[in-house]
């Protein structure tokens, strides 16, 4: 059984540039992936060579970090160290397998100061050759999407 370690060092600076425009013209910056060590946990599922972090299990308002280490029932692990996310993928050696690949998708939910909830997806597609080197890689980032707006209970004065 071979183990390939895929390093994703670009997600942290990518996410930290995320901005949301506010109604009053101001801009809020959400550094979503930071090595801040507070142990914010994510639910994780891994099928074949696909790694997906589905949602944060803790609410954080301006920062989300990936807890390390943890494993799922398949024995795969997803580890974050020093702002570098590593997906450790178990690759079975079936005959002459020349390469394998997959996609890592982080689905991050976060709240702003007014308790509106946003979701943002960060995708990383990759191929690994027989020498365990990344032969091709592609990044995708979606804009933050408002998925839950805070209910306003105050009566407006006329």
Predicted regions and their residues:
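An amphipathic alpha-helical interaction surface
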Residues: 42-45, 49-158
């Amino acid at each position: 059984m071979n183990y390939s370690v895929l390093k994703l060092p670009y997600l942290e600076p990518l996410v930290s540039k995320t901005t949301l425009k506010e109604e009053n013209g101001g801009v809020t910056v959400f550094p979503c992936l930071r090595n801040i060590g507070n142990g914010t946990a994510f639910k994780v599922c891994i099928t074949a060579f696909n790694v997906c972090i589905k949602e944060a299990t803790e609410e954080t308002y301006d920062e989300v970090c990936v807890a390390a280490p943890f494993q799922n029932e398949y024995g795969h692990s997803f580890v974050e160290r020093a702002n570098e996310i590593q997906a450790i993928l178990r690759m079975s050696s079936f005959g002459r397998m020349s390469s394998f690949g997959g996609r890592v998708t982080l689905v991050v939910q976060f709240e702003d100061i007014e308790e509106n909830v946003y979701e943002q997806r960060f995708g990383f597609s990759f191929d690994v050759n027989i020498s365990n080197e990344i032969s091709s890689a592609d990044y995708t980032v979606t804009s933050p999407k408002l998925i839950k707006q805070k209910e306003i209970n105050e009566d407006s004065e006329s």
